Swiss-Prot record:
Extracellular-side positions: 30-170
Membrane-spanning ranges: 171-191
Name of this protein: Tumor necrosis factor receptor superfamily member 19
Role noted for this protein: Can mediate activation of JNK and NF-kappa-B. May promote caspase-independent cell death.
Lineage of the organism: Eukaryota, Metazoa, Chordata, Craniata, Vertebrata
Glycosylation sites noted in the Swiss-Prot or TrEMBL record: 105
Assembly notes: Associates with TRAF1, TRAF2, TRAF3 and TRAF5. Interacts with LINGO1.
Length: 423
């Protein structure tokens, strides 16, 4: 059984080989018998290809058994054919490419005819004596042996085409937009830089105004820092204290009057500083003084501030006008113009010196408090006697509330002050 199967497979394979050989032989015989310009017709015979006349060519390739249906057609554009034959049409010569004049145009039956070289070009001569078809530029300087390069060519300048109005308008719009954007950016940068500069810049003017107008609000312990300012600034302090300061701000204004006084070193503040309290406590009597008297100073200043509006002169504008009229006067000049002020000051100072050894700090506070009151009453020389009595009554009530004991020497000082008020 196996042998029979192998025999049948061999027969099938051999049959296929014979069939393939026959087909290949048939194809070879059909195409191989015809020559280059021959094609095989329907009967299987090789027939020569058709020849076309001038200006015509076959529509398809013909030869080696192919091109049975090829026909003659006219040459395509820019091509020509001068003779009969099997060849195809050739491309025409372009005289502009070779830099030469064109004498005749190209046609289907003839090629284009080129003339001499264009101005500024010449034809090179080969070694064998023939000239090239293409003309080359003369160059600078031109070769002397070429006649075509001897004369220069007059070139005509062609005017450039003017731009259209639409392009001009578009360019103007673009430039305007760019300029606007740049200007806006510049303005924003300036504003930003100015804000940054103002935020970082210290406000010296505001600080000076705060020192000038708010100086009366400082406590008496801070007044030594303000002695460096001039007499004119002190007058400004007195001028504005009545208008801008409330009842609480009127008590420290004595410090401003102290700066305006003829001799600031001798008068002092109505309430002593911490340094003066320590100096007095160093004496024999200071050893027995309780430590809470330091806080009593602030309470006296606070209680006296409530009563200070009652002691103000309703006609205090005269003193302000005096400062305004003579702002250039120094402390010594004002001292010389007011001899009564010297006597008042000397009386108060003598009375205070007599009480340094034997009086307690509470009595010294009342004494200095009386001296400051006398100074303010002298500056207001037109105070009526009724207002003086009211102020004295108010001061005595304040002293009683604070627990202070009025010393007999203090009463003497009060009598001196009453005499000055009656003047």
């Amino acid at each position: 059984m196996a042998l029979k199967v192998l025999l049948e497979q061999e027969k099938t394979f051999f049959t296929l080989l014979v069939l393939l050989g026959y087909l290949s032989c048939k194809v070879t015989c059909e195409s191989g018998d015809c020559r280059q310009q021959e094609f095989r017709d329907r009967s299987g015979n090789c027939v020569p290809c058709n020849q076309c006349g001038p200006g015509m060519e076959l529509s398809k390739e013909c030869g080696f058994g192919y091109g049975e249906d090829a026909q003659c057609v006219t040459c395509r554009l820019h091509r020509f054919k001068e003779d009969w034959g099997f060849q195809k049409c050739k491309p025409c010569l372009d005289c502009a490419v070779v830099n030469r004049f064109q004498k005749a145009n190209c046609s289907a039956t003839s090629d284009a005819i080129c003339g001499d070289c264009l101005p500024g070009f010449y034809r090179k001569t080969k070694l064998v004596g023939f000239q090239d078809m293409e003309c080359v530029p003369c160059g600078d300087p031109p070769p002397p042996y070429e006649p075509h390069c001897a004369s220069k060519v007059n070139l005509v300048k062609i005017a450039s085409t003017a731009s259209s109005p639409r392009d001009t308008a578009l360019a103007a719009v673009i430039c305007s937009a760019l300029a606007t954007v740049l200007l806006a950016l510049l303005i924003l940068c300036v504003i930003y830089c100015k804000r940054q500069f103002m935020e970082k810049k210290p406000s010296w003017s505001l600080r000076s105004q705060d020192i000038q107008y708010n100086g009366s609000e400082l406590s008496c312990f801070d007044r030594p820092q303000l002695h460096e300012y001039a007499h004119r600034a002190c007058c400004q302090c007195r001028r504005d204290s009545v208008q801008t300061c409330g009842p609480v701000r009127l008590l420290p204004s004595m410090c401003c009057e102290e700066a305006c006084s003829p001799n600031p070193a001798t008068l002092g503040c109505g309430v002593h500083s911490a340094a003066s309290l320590q100096a007095r406590n160093a004496g024999p009597a200071g050893e027995m003084v309780p430590t809470f008297f330091g806080s009593l100073t602030q309470s006296i200043c606070g209680e006296f501030s409530d009563a200070w509006p009652l002691m103000q002169n309703p006609m205090g504008g005269d003193n302000i006008s005096f400062c305004d009229s003579y702002p250039e006067l120094t402390g010594e000049d004002i001292h010389s113009l007011n001899p009564e002020l010297e006597s008042s000051t000397s009386l108060d100072s003598n009375s205070s010196q007599d009480l340094v050894g034997g009086a307690v700090p509470v009595q010294s506070h009342s004494e200095n408090f009386t001296a400051a009151t006398d100074l303010s009453r002298y500056n207001n020389t037109l105070v009526e006697s009724a207002s003086t009595q009211d102020a004295l009554t108010m001061r005595s009530q304040l002293d009683q509330e604070s627990g202070a004991v009025i010393h007999p020497a203090t009463q003497t000082s009060l009598q001196v002050r009453q005499r000055l008020g009656s003047l």
